[in-house]
């Protein structure tokens, strides 16, 4: 993992050195096989993610090198987006990337369907979910191109103040992550 103290300046993240030290301790606790990276199974040990149907998408976004695991560098960069000191734009971009599965800068009808399906499971029939997706695209797609841009997404999500809910607290004296 290297010297945790160097990560603050190296990564331009929003954590101070003490927070990075505590995150390092949490990371090592999660890294059961001591490989220096977290598998999806190890990542799922975070209580906040155990019941989250989007955990796979979160890991995909954290895993910037695409190797299927999250190393300490990716862990710090990923969790830094949720720091109380993180800016609204970063949090909105993260939320957008949950839906933008192919990372092309737009949320398509199919991508919205896939992500919502992860969230609702079998609670809605596919045709009901598709109606919801179609209506959402119709309402959110201001330029009429059939997909949702980051700007269109942000216009709606900003009014919900979701960025204030996308926060990780690194508490003093407690080594667990809180979301």
Curated annotation (Swiss-Prot):
PROSITE patterns, alphabetized: EF_HAND_1, EF_HAND_2
Binding residue positions for Ca(2+) 4: 141, 143, 145, 147, 152
SUPFAM superfamilies named among the record's database cross-references: EF-hand
Q: Coiled-coil regions in this chain?
A: none
Residues holding Ca(2+) 3: 100, 102, 104, 111
Protein residues bound to Ca(2+) 2:
63, 65, 67, 69, 74
Question: GO CC annotations?
Answer: calcineurin complex; cytosol; mitochondrion; protein serine/threonine phosphatase complex; sperm flagellum; sperm midpiece; sperm mitochondrial sheath
Name where it's found: Mitochondrion
Species of origin? Mus musculus (Mouse)
Q: What does the tissue specificity note say? A: Expressed in osteoblasts and bone marrow (at protein level). Expressed in the testis. Expressed in the sperm midpiece in a SPATA33-dependent manner (at protein level).
Output this protein's name: Calcineurin subunit B type 2
InterPro entries for the chain: EF-hand-dom_pair, EF_Hand_1_Ca_BS, EF_hand_dom
The positions annotated as site (Interaction with PxVP motif in substrates of the catalytic subunit) read 118, 122
One of the GO biological process terms: positive regulation of calcineurin-NFAT signaling cascade
**Region described as Calcineurin A binding:** 131-136
Additional observations: This protein has four functional calcium-binding sites.
Q: Which positions are annotated as binding Ca(2+) 1?
A: 31, 33, 35, 37, 42
* UniProt KW keywords: Calcium, Lipoprotein, Metal-binding, Mitochondrion, Myristate, Repeat
Record-stated family:
Belongs to the calcineurin regulatory subunit family.
Listed GO MF terms:
calcium ion binding; calcium-dependent protein serine/threonine phosphatase regulator activity
What's a Pfam family in this record? Answer: EF-hand_7
What does the function comment of this entry state? Regulatory subunit of calcineurin, a calcium-dependent, calmodulin stimulated protein phosphatase. Confers calcium sensitivity.
Query: Where does the EF-hand domain lie?
Result: 18-53, 57-85, 87-122, 128-163
Lipid-linked residues (N-myristoyl glycine): 2
Carries keyword Lipoprotein?
yes
